[in-house]
Amino acid sequence: MKRALLLTVCMAAIAAISQAQQTTVNVETAGTLSEQIGSDKYTITSLKITGNLNGTDFILLRDMAGIDLDNVPTEGKLATLDLSEAKVVAGGEAYYTDYVNNKEFYTNDNEMGNCIFYSCDKLESLSLPAGTTVVGDSAFMRCTALSEITLPDGLKEIRSYAFSETQIASFSFVNGIMPAKGMFRNCGKLTSVTLPEECEEIPANTFSGTAITEITLPKNLVKIGKEAFSSCMLTSLECPATLEEIDESAFFMCSSLASVSLNDGLQSIEGSAFSYCDKLETIEIPNSVTELEGCFSNCTALKSAVLPEGLTAIPDYMFDRCSNLESVNIPEGVKTIGDNAFQNNMRLLDVVFPEGLESIGENAFSSCYTMENINLPETVKTIGEGAFDGCEGVVVMSLPGSITTIPRNAFSYMVYLEELTIGEGTKTIDQMAFINCESLTKLTLPSTLESIGYAAFAYNMLTEVDCKAVTPPACDNTSFAGWDSDVPQDCLLYVPQGAKAEYEKADVWKEFIIKESETSGIESETAAGATETARYGIDGRKLAKPARGINIIRMSDGTARKVINR
């Protein structure tokens, strides 16, 4: 009996009672919680506190929930914490130290301050004080077991990363509270969210890495921030009429996103906004979009895309590695196609290049294996290295002379290319520009050509070269090199009348079988019985049928002749 009485007295002394494994403590004077918890701090699993709490008390609570003042894990087991009848007051010691930024955090009245339970990985359920008005930055970040939190009606603000890396499964924004940056970042169990109708912006990282499968965006939404939904489980997206901006990587790697409806009125889509959305099959970008960055790269299921009519530039990496893309429109006003814009679009058949196009970037159409036609307008002035490298489907190609320099690897590994005409105006063909065009048999070079670089036409099957330059272009013994010779064996070289002697003295060129062309530089005698095999316009473009003006006809015996159709 005496022992029982003594135990009752001791429990009264610490003002705590145990009911169904919950310990209840009243802290009349802030900063005295440790006196009442005593040696039980590592055994209590469920705790309710009434009274006043300051920074000193939260040092203990953090210790009980698994992390000490030096951010070292403890033996604490506190899983359930009810502070609904407690009050946070200013004062006491710093409850948390950010050693990276050398910053200490102290309590303020009615605030759950920055990092107040940061990394308390034992905490599973928490009820906040009824008077709480603010939840601070990273307040519960990395509370990796926290699945239930009760917020008071008077709460006015939740700040950035407050619940990041917790186990919260659902959340409704009420009482005017707005989403904050990184608020639920990497909350892998979060599946349901209700956003406030008055919300105008979803900040960066708000829902990245969550398990949300569907969400209704607010009718007043204006902006979706950087990585706002990246790596989440969304299956569809319907943008409200008010939306103006989708920021960088907003839906990056949403691997279940199969349907996207973009609104008229949308103005900008930033880089990688929908990259790696590998279930997305179609996309139509509204004409209201005026700012566009490379936002659909690695969408491997994407089959068709519609670009806005007012677009003047296709950005770098726009559809890079969209391996199933079959069709895309290039708007009439486009002047620039960026680097890697359509790289590795292995099913892209044909692209219509608009008049007015001026430049094509590096690797823009590299490894577009199924492209069959490359018809560039005379307005194109520059193309980047590797622009059409590996476009295996092209058989006949004519390039405009407006491209004064054909750069390195621009058309290399076009293994089925048989006939190539380079237009008047081109001066330089850089190294390896057409290397490994293994089926190339007929080549026409312009009178303006001055130099041919290292291995520019190496490893081909050339049987005929028609070079219209009076002065032999500079080249070296690799420019036309084959597997076992400097030039293709038994290859005919047609040169302008009067230029044969110069070519016979020129290194490399003298290895060809040299013949002078007719006066036109195009016509030659046609053998009896020879038939037409191909027809070209004066600009070098292949013709499907006779056209008015000068036609260049390729004959079955390897000769060419010029006719004028009136």
Segments the model singles out, each with a brief description of its role:
Residues 1-22:
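Bacterial Sec-dependent N-terminal signal peptides
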Residues 1-3, 552-566:
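C-terminal tail/sorting-segment detector
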Residues 22-28, 45-53, 74-110, 121-134, ...:
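Structural signature of tandem-repeat unit edges
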Residues 31-40, 56-66, 70, 171, ...:
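Short, T/G/N/S-enriched strand-turn elements that build extracellular solenoid repeat scaffolds
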Residues 47, 503, 520-524, 540, ...:
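Terminal processing/anchoring signals of secreted or surface-associated proteins
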Residues 113-116, 136-141, 159-162, 181-183, ...:
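Consensus positions within tandem repeat domains that build extended binding/scaffold surfaces
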Residues 516-539:
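Residue-level detector of functionally pivotal "anchor" positions at catalytic/ligand-binding pockets or at interdomain
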Residues 537-559:
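Short, surface-exposed loop/turn motifs with a glycine/proline- and acidic-biased composition
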